[in-house]
């Protein structure tokens, strides 16, 4: 994770749509961080902070993001973040692959014709020690595509 943070710190990325980028980065040791460019500072410094989850808002300013509404430059999706955190708290004794899928399902969104960002297009559960990923497209939870990095193999 630290290596990825250092790599990103050498870039200044700005989304032309008026929103900025943020990334959730983890490694096999369990180090997970949200990495984002500070939207309140003119110099937009890169900030990396330990967090267990993130949705469509700046983690740096999560205290300024209220659920079920737009929150200006800070983003939206607090209710989905809260749903993920509830799953993680309920299963705090030990996360499993089922924990990941429970959290992804809890935070998924059905399409909403008046809100372009309200459609979960894909969900991915990464296994950083097994070097695998399970992918679900458009909330078809029973149709899992599996990928193995070590085997460079895709299965359905």
Per-segment meaning from a language model:
Residues 1-13:
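Compact, glycine/acidic-enriched structural inserts
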Residues 18-21, 26-156:
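C-terminal, well-structured catalytic/ligand-binding subdomain of enzymes
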């Amino acid at each position: 994770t630290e290596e990825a943070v250092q790599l990103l710190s050498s870039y200044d990325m700005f989304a032309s749509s008026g929103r900025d980028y943020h990334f959730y980065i983890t490694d096999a040791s369990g180090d997970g961080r949200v990495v984002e460019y500070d939207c309140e500072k003119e110099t937009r410094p890169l900030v990396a902070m330990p967090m267990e989850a993130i949705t469509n808002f700046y983690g740096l300013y999560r205290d300024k993001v209220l659920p079920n509404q737009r929150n200006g430059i800070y983003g939206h999706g607090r209710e989905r973040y809260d749903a993920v955190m509830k799953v993680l708290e309920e299963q705090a004794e030990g996360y499993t692959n089922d924990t990941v899928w429970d959290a992804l399902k809890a935070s998924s969104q059905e399409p909403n014709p008046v809100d372009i960002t309200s459609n979960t297009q894909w969900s991915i559960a990464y296994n950083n020690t097994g070097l695998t990923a399970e992918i679900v497209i458009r909330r078809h939870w029973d149709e899992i595509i599996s990928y193995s990095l070590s085997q460079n193999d895709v299965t359905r």
